[in-house]
Amino acid sequence: MKPEISEQPLKGLFGSESAYRVLMYLENYDNGYASQIAGTFDISLSQAQIQLKKFEELGLLVSRIEGTTRMYYFKRSPVSDALRIFLRSMLDVLPTPTIRKYYRQRRRPRRYGKR
């Protein structure tokens, strides 16, 4: 049985729950956009946008327009690489209900004809 941790210290470490959620989402799914992140965690769209913009200005994230959507990704740098290692290790010890609720969403449609 794996050890499980509380999310509370992580929220404090990153300064806010929305900052914590944004970074954990991007680490788990590799990319994302503001409304997708906001909908997953039931936070306001503006909070997700503020956090994404803040992390982009700090140099942790990069974004690009894909169609009409601004997608965010981790920037390749020693700082963001170290942060991602930390975030991945935290994802590995989150409580199982939290993992199921937030970090195991279907990202593609089901194959046609699958039963």
Question: What are the residue ranges of the model-derived segments?
Answer:
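Pre-recognition alpha-helix immediately N-terminal to the DNA-recognition helix
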Residues: E17-E27
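Short, hydrophobic-biased segments on the C-terminal half of alpha helices
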Residues: L52-K53
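Amphipathic alpha-helical dimerization/coiled-coil segments
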Residues: E4, V79-R115
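A short, conserved structural fragment
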Residues: E56-E66
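A short acidic, leucine-rich amphipathic alpha-helix
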Residues: Q36-T40
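Key DNA-contact positions within bacterial/archaeal DNA-binding proteins
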Residues: S46
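Short, cationic-aromatic polyanion-contact patches
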Residues: Q8-A19, Y33, E66-R88
